[in-house]
Amino acid sequence: MSRIVNCVKLKREAEGLDFPPYPGELGTRIWQQISKEAWEEWKQIQTRLVNENRLNLADARARKYLQQQMERFLFEDGTVEAQGYVPPSA
């Protein structure tokens, strides 16, 4: 049986994550307040940020930047998009 959470990103009830996707208190907060759908949206944006900005995830500054963008996207109603990204035309 799937968990239902009141997703703060989508502002509605939705299926929750199966486990905390990130370590520590932030991971617990995401698990409690973010839906699978919103987390999948974040993962797509994260991939674009890494690719477009050529981030090296071995660099602590790059990881900190991604964490800040993740918190902004998931909890602060911030729109996060990679500069220079052009969505594919339909």
Swiss-Prot record:
GO terms for cellular component: cytosol. Belongs to the Fe(2+)-trafficking protein family. One of its GO terms (biological process) is cellular response to oxidative stress. Pfam families: Iron_traffic. One of its GO terms (molecular function) is iron ion binding. This is Probable Fe(2+)-trafficking protein. Keywords: Iron. SUPFAM superfamilies: YggX-like (SSF111148). Could be a mediator in iron transactions between iron acquisition and iron-requiring processes, such as synthesis and/or repair of Fe-S clusters in biosynthetic enzymes.
